């Protein structure tokens, strides 16, 4: 019996797509899920929350958003034909506190996600075993997809943690609400 997985691909004994196509569809859905979770957390922030740092060594939500956007532009622009670490990227600058408004950061974020998802959506199953380079290191496209999904998941988790911390009692759960705690 077959059923539809979270990505929309058929799974089970009568699988109608090959494993490469299934992996691509699953990865596309996972990237979109990371974006959605981050955006649901970002939507709960007040403008002043974006630049709060828990301590001098911590990143604010604004820094994390700027870093993710810089990483996405670098990794996904000309993904199949150029190194994923572009010379014009100012990675160190992504981690300097700035004064960008939430609107400007959201525009940068949306643009970066547009590049990312357009690139991933354009991939074909045969591309998964092609070799790309990131910081001079050869990786299969499948490895690069998984590596970036892991990286983004870490930062999305940071965004969610910070947003939940900053919003306190006004936080709206992104999934199943936790039961009230005693004491």
Cite the ranges covered by each PLM segment.
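Short, contiguous alpha-helical
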Residues: 2-6, 10, 14, 24, ...
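Acidic/histidine-rich alpha-helical segments that form the ligand environment
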Residues: 94-132, 140-152, 158
């Amino acid at each position: 019996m077959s059923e539809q997985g979270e990505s929309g691909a058929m799974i089970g004994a009568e699988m109608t797509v090959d494993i490469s196509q299934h992996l691509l569809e699953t990865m596309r859905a996972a990237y979109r899920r990371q974006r959605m979770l981050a955006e649901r957390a970002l939507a709960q922030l007040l403008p002043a929350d974006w630049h709060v740092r828990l301590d001098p060594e911590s990143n604010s939500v604004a820094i994390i958003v700027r870093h993710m956007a810089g990483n996405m532009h670098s990794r996904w622009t000309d993904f199949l034909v150029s190194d994923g670490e572009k010379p014009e990227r100012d990675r160190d600058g992504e981690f300097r506190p700035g004064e960008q408004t939430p609107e400007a950061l959201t525009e940068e974020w949306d643009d970066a996600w547009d590049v990312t998802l357009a690139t991933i959506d354009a991939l074909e199953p045969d591309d998964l075993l092609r070799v790309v380079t990131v910081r001079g290191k050869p990786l299969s496209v499948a490895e690069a997809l998984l590596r970036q999904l892991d990286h983004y998941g870490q930062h999305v988790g940071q965004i969610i943690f910070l947003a939940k911390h900053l919003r306190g009692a006004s936080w709206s759960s992104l999934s199943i609400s936790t039961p009230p705690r005693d004491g």
